Amino acid sequence: AAMREAMAAADVGDDVYRDDPTVLALERRTADLLGKDDAVYMPTGTMTNQVAIRTHTEPGDQILIDANAHVARAEAGGPAALSGVMTKGLPGIHGVFTAEDVHAAAMPVHPFTPATLLPPTKLLCIENTHNGGGGTIWPLDAVEAVCAAGRQHGLRLHMDGARLWHASVATGVSEREYAAPFDTVSVCFSKGLGAPVGSALAGSSELVARARRFKAMFGGGFRQAGVVAAGALHALEHHRAGLAADHSKATAFAGGLSRITGIGIDLARVQTNIVRFTLAAMPSGAFVERCHDAGLHLLTTGADGVRAVPHADISEAQIQKALAIVGAVVSEQAA
């Protein structure tokens, strides 16, 4: 209710002309939290990531990224279509790769291969937390190590921090500390924070000015954007601390799943608010459909994989109800 009231009362203007006071306030607050000069508000996290790639690269370049990262697998082929770049997948473990992986990928394929035959490697991206890895947190020392390796090869650095708020709450490492090594950082105001619309891209004044051009090119211009920016600003100021409760609900749900015969889960991988598990004897599609019919909404992650994401609107009682639904569906299949 408080977020809706803030949105209804928002001062608005025209973001295209940069005279929307609420958007400007959101951009200033985001830049300050991340320790950057400036930030630009956009409709989606996919747009902030793709604008960042276009800002840092030219067609024919190559970017280094975990092979299962959102940018590489779930942004509609944007790097190729919008920036004309290649993605070189790094062999991360649940999304986390090493400095050695960066060195190996950034080196020429063969010392005698002419440089003119190779795509210039320009950008290194990480995703923190890592969605495909199950909400995996990058430790700060691992972030600093891979960024240092990237700098050794002259690479620019971008962090897809759509869920950075989760990493910060879980570890106690501030968003500013996590963002410090990077040229640009994207953050999302809906992932856990509960705003209806929007992400922001933060960086130096020069990079953000360049990014604003590509925001316009990619169709990201708003008019009375303050209405949705007010929701994002409210979420930023009031909802970050509540993420710890979401993590506790995920831990409780995962623990309950581990006691259900026919469910496979690695509890060590449940680090934030994403719970991934496998089914021993039932296709995930049929399982998710049965759960949906019973009032539990889940996603498939492959033939036998399932993903659940507790959030602020889910109560502890609903976690127990969800476990009961899962147990009933699995038992029915076994019978």
Where are these regions (language model features)?
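Conserved PLP-enzyme active-site core in the AAT-like
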Residues: 1-10, 14-281, 285-294, 298-314, ...
